[in-house]
Amino acid sequence: SGILQINILIGTIIASYETGAVSFLYYADRIYQLPLALIGIAIGIVLLPSISKKIKENKKLSINKTIEKTIVYSMLLAIPASVALYVMPEIIISFLFERGAFDAISTHNSSMALKVFSLGLIAFILVKILTPIFFANENSKLPLNFSIITVILNTLLSIFLFLELGFLGIAAATVISSWFNVVLLYFYLFKNKYFSHSNEIFAPLFVILVVSSLLGFYLFVIKNVYLSLSFSNFFYDALFFITILISGLVVFFTMISFYKPFNYVNLKKQILSDE
């Protein structure tokens, strides 16, 4: 989103006062932007017209169900992605970038930044879900005001945390300010009855959290196997990396499918449903 890019720009300016920090943040940013783009942008494009249509038809219950469904299915992708980025940042960064001037130290520092950014991936995506609800209700002023508040908070936090933690403080400031933005958006939506979720949303989210935790344990174990082998051949390195990626997806979606609403048939039916 625009607010996230502004926060990153501010962070980049502040990071320029530490040698190499801009590069560390840049490479970490490139990685987490991929799931953010795939999930967040698609959600925004699909959600806004659907919500706008239902607001005009005054289908309040249907609006809430659509938003709930969007949150659940975006979290079905965002939470495991966040876990994977947190558990395996060094493997991802090393495989994609560690060559030439980008050495092991650069990999370590970029990996630490990616680990911090991964804690904000869910918040970045929730902002993309909640903001269109304001636009669908023809209220673009409040998200703008919240964005300004978030930018100010991010700037102050970036300066303070940079002095304490270096470039990692900038990543932390971006994450904290994004979660703060989520809180502002959510409570205003809830307070003004733009959106009110039911208790039914908690069970699937809990299942996603549990299965994602199991995925995290699996990735942690296989990561240590990968690091102990220390391939010097790029072909074998790439083969093992792809194996980790595919096996992680298989493990997650196999486990999650045991929860009936997330098995293939019900998942397909719910995604295609307009309710």
Task: Set out the residue ranges of the language-model regions.
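Membrane-embedded alpha-helical bundles of multi-pass transporters/translocases
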Residues: S1-E275
